[in-house]
């Protein structure tokens, strides 16, 4: 194909126009914790995550996985480097603007569901909307009820957390994370407090919601089976990020201590 200056441009060059938009980008991300001595955790992490991706972050305990997730969620600040969320450098935002960013653009799922015992499942799921807007609209309420029905809680939404199982509570937490229709969902060991069967069910729901919502999901996990089912696998090792293919991840798992699901 001829270019504007008469040169021939190959037709098979990769096109960025067809790629989903970047929702997370970090450059030179560093984090050092200061106590009696400086403890460096992240050493110049460069990362790009696009809308609709499902990314698993693996690594040994203490490698910085959760620290990275907290920085991506604007819950912590890096020592150096930049974080862009939906093309906004979050270092330029005020505290109020950061709070709005977290409310509007990012959903969080934690290992422990953190549902409030005094509220019903529906009220807990609506909590991000209530905090953001003061009161939900009929359309927002209907959407959240629809999500609860889709995750199998259509007949449970009136119950309180202590009346539901751990898996049901975590399903409610997934709906809560999606309540404000965020572009990014960050999950820190979302199945770590569940038995294997419940964990696999919760993960399957997360994958389904990822596909249907188009939100980018970023999940920290020690479960190599779940990491294998993600779209991408990122290893945090010695404070550095490295992309792992599935074959390499399986090989690392087999060469670990022999335990299944706890290799990272």
Feature-to-residue mapping (PLM):
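ABC-family P-loop ATPase nucleotide-binding domain
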Residues: 1-31, 242-264
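ABC family nucleotide-binding domain
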Residues: 21-238
């Amino acid at each position: 194909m001829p270019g504007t200056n008469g040169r021939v441009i190959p037709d098979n060059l990769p096109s960025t126009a067809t790629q989903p938009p970047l929702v997370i980008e970090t450059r030179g991300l560093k984090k050092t914790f200061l106590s009696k001595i400086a403890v460096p955790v992240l050493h110049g992490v460069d990362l790009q995550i696009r809308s609709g991706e499902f990314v698993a972050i693996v690594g040994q305990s203490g490698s910085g996985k959760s620290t990275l997730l907290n920085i991506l969620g604007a819950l912590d600040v890096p020592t150096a480097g930049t974080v862009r969320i939906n093309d906004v450098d979050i270092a330029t935002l005020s505290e109020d603007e950061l709070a709005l960013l977290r409310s509007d653009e990012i959903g969080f799922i934690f290992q422990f569901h953190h549902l409030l015992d005094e509220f019903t499942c529906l009220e807990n799921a609506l909590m991000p909307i209530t905090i953001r807007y003061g009161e939900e609209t009929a359309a927002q309420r209907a959407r959240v009820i629809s999500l609860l029905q889709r995750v199998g809680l259509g007949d449970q939404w009136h119950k309180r957390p202590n009346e539901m199982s751990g898996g049901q509570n975590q399903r409610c937490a997934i709906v809560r994370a999606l309540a404000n229709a965020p572009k990014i969902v960050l999950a820190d060991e979302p199945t770590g407090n569940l038995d294997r069967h419940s964990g696999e069910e919760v993960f399957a729901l997360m994958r389904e919601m990822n596909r249907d919502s188009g939100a980018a999901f970023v999940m920290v996990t020690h479960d190599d089976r779940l990491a294998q089912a993600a779209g991408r696998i990122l290893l945090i090792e010695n404070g550095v990020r490295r992309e792992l293919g599935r074959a390499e991840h399986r090989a690392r798992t087999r060469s670990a201590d022999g335990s299944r699901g706890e290799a990272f």
